[in-house]
Amino acid sequence: MKTGRMQKPGRVAMKNARDFLIVTNNPLLAQCMEDCYELSFFPDCSYREILVKVRDLVYVGHTLYTHPLSGSVKPNETPYKSIAVSKVPHAFSAEQAGIIAECILAADKFPPRTRALSEAVKRDFQLIDYTLLAGALEFDAAAGLSKIKNHE
């Protein structure tokens, strides 16, 4: 349906898993979804660096399928971020570029995290990021988690 207006990120009708790409730094998400979706996994990137990578994709015409600041966890609280974008670039959208640029500016307003996170807290933040994206994609989060539990 072409109306000349962008649908809100997260509201874009996704045809199937082959239509989009997940950009993430979340190792839990990468493990759970690697067999179902195409991933660009950047384990050493920060939350902000993931936003910048997505911005670069949007600038060449990729479409945001999930909102870059989804969820209620502040950017300075969690190190993990996962965003779904179109797998194939289309025409550049100034509206999409504006959304991701504003998200980067919003993330920059928060002071950087200075305290180290325990492994348990990191796992919790990984799970939060994973379940947010799984919900947006209507992915069976429990099945993904059981897949990795069965391989341990």
Role assignments for model-derived ranges:
Residues M14-K15, C32:
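Glycine-rich, flexible N-terminal cofactor/catalytic loop recognition
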Residues M33-T78:
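Rossmann-like NAD(P)(H) cofactor-binding subdomain of soluble oxidoreductases
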Residues M1-A13:
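N-terminal amphipathic/basic-hydrophobic helices that include classical n-h-c signal peptides
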Residues R18-F20:
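Extreme N-terminal starter segment of soluble prokaryotic enzymes
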Residues V23-A30:
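Short, polar loop motifs at secondary-structure junctions
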Residues N26, L69-V73, P89:
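Glycine-rich beta-alpha junction loops
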Residues N76-H90:
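Short basic, glycine-rich beta-strand/loop surfaces that mediate nucleic-acid
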